[in-house]
């Protein structure tokens, strides 16, 4: 694979090659950070579970807090409408 890439190296000038390498390096560092953060979040949820909290509900609360209040109210109203239409509420 490296042999295939070598003939194309001259397609990009040295500045572009440097920029490309920098971008790739940054993305790779961010991917590592993302993995580390995901592990930390997992640990927080495990701590919450250990303290008796329902992790599924906590995740839902976090997700809901990310949503705009008006958008959430609109979704709730539509959900209630649908549930009412099928006799669930």
Curated annotation (Swiss-Prot):
InterPro entries: GapR-like, GapR-like_DNA-bd. Signal peptide: none annotated. One of its GO terms (molecular function) is DNA binding. HAMAP family: UPF0335. Belongs to the UPF0335 family. This is UPF0335 protein Caul_0876.
């Amino acid at each position: 694979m490296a042999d295939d890439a070598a003939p194309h190296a001259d397609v990009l000038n040295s500045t572009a090659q440097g920029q490309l390498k920098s971008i790739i390096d940054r993305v790779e560092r961010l991917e590592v950070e993302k993995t580390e953060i995901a592990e930390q979040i997992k640990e927080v949820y495990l701590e919450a579970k250990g303290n008796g909290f329902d992790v599924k509900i906590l995740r839902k609360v976090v997700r809901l807090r990310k949503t705009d209040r008006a958008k959430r109210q609109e979704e709730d109203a539509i959900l209630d409408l649908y549930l009412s239409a099928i006799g669930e509420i």
